[in-house]
């Protein structure tokens, strides 16, 4: 059985912009920020409707690889830590045993499904067959890490960098924070920004040169480069915070120059939305 009261935390987290704090029995991160519209978009991805309608009485082994990742996204959105359950099946069984939780989820899903207006497009990456991401969709970092295979049910990624790689899959995720209010003259150079709706200027980490191993991978196009951007009011102290990134899809190398860091121009396979371009082009960024 799920701990008493956790269904209230689940529902409240979907309907409130902020949870003041979570008690020791809760599994939600403190001050989790998620609005109604974002929650509606998230719910549409998680198979919530399918799972809730069946009272979570499903066989995890029957899910496709993409559906399994969707379910693992659900796990991390609820618990935000590895090891709460040993398997997705154990999570489904625990949910199914709590009838009140199931009924609350059903009611919430139906209500928010009606509000969900998500201008998303099919994934354009080479890994679209297995990744549950939609271009222009909004995702937390934990959800992205599930998609690229660095978050597992028994292991959570410890990455706090502006990029994250899974060499087994040949993927690199670029996490770019677009800073709205940054101090002129700051020692930090914010040099990641949209050149137009289909071109993005990005700087590598300071250690990367064209001759370095990772620099060669960029030049030789050995990695599938996935671009994620989000707007921040100020410089974030913790890049792992659960604010959403907009997925701009796989990008391709156009040009590069410089060393430590390299300055790279990427071409987006799908043009970014005008609303994204309006902040990504106007403000410089922290990557």
Residue ranges and their predicted role:
Residues 237-287:
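Compact mixed alphabeta submodule
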Residues 1-133:
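C-terminal helical accessory/scaffold domains
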Residues 3-52, 134-244:
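Acidic, glycine-rich low-complexity segments with interspersed aromatic residues
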């Amino acid at each position: 059985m799920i701990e008493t009261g956790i269904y209230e935390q689940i529902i409240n987290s979907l309907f409130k912009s902020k949870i003041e704090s979570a008690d020791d029995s809760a599994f939600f991160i403190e001050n989790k920020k998620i609005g109604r519209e974002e929650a509606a978009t998230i719910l549409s991805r998680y198979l919530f409707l399918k799972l809730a309608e069946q009272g979570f009485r499903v066989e995890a082994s029957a899910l496709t690889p993409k559906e399994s990742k969707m379910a693992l996204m659900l796990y991390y959105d609820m618990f935000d830590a590895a090891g709460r359950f040993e398997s997705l099946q154990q999570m489904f069984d625990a949910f199914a045993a709590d009838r009140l939780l199931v009924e609350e989820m059903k009611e919430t899903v139906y209500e928010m499904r009606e509000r969900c207006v998500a201008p998303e497009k099919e994934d354009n990456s080479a890994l679209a067959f297995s990744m549950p991401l939609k271009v222009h969709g909004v995702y937390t970092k934990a959800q992205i890490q599930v998609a690229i295979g660095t978050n597992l049910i028994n292991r959570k990624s410890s990455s706090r960098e502006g990029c994250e790689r899974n060499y087994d899959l040949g993927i690199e995720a670029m996490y770019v924070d677009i800073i709205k209010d940054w101090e002129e003259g700051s020692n930090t150079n914010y040099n990641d920004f949209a050149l137009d709706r289909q071109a993005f200027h990005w700087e590598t980490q300071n250690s990367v040169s064209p001759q370095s191993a990772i620099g060669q991978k960029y030049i030789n196009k050995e990695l599938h480069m996935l671009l994620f951007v989000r707007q921040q009011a100020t410089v974030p102290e913790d890049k792992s915070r659960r604010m959403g990134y907009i997925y701009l899809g796989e990008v391709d190398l156009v040009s590069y120059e410089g060393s430590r860091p390299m300055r790279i121009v990427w071409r987006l396979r799908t043009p970014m939305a005008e609303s994204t371009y309006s902040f990504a082009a106007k403000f410089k960024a922290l990557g």
